[in-house]
Amino acid sequence: MTSPADLPVAAPAPRFFWEDFPVGQVREFGRHEVTREAVLAFARDFDPQPFHLDDAAAEASLFGRLAASGWHTCAMAMRMLCEGYLLESASLGSPGIEQLKWLKPVYPGDVLHVRLEVVEARPMASRPTVGLVRSRTTVLNQAGDAVLTMEGLGMFRRRTPGST
């Protein structure tokens, strides 16, 4: 994974526009190793539930051992999405996530990657320079098991405004 210091200060010219996300397209990218230190740090700062912070509490929980917060998993997914394509795209942000499911726990030592499937792409009626992309994101662990799914919309500048 790229460190924050390695990220560009100014956005480069976009490689990907709305037209580059046809329905049915599937992209797989990213590699993020989950560390115990990161699980504990995220939990301390953002989700201080005992099963994310304490080995004994985690062992007594449904997780059976220390597990990452689901919100930490979302944050790791977002980082992989940024590095995988968003930082190189004409992204204009997102109006939101419509569905989010945590399917399996994420543990220290897991290695995650992302699969992104475009399920809808349409021009934005009120803004001819913008297109909407609905995507289904799946985060998978090293065994290929889905640990998280989410579906949401992204807004992207169009390369050719007004085209269909």
Give names to the regions the model predicted:
Residues 95-98, 114:
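Short beta-strand or tight-loop elements
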Residues 2-22, 102-164:
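HotDog/MaoC-like acyl-thioester-processing domains
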Residues 2-96, 161-164:
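Hot-dog-fold acyl-thioester-processing enzymes
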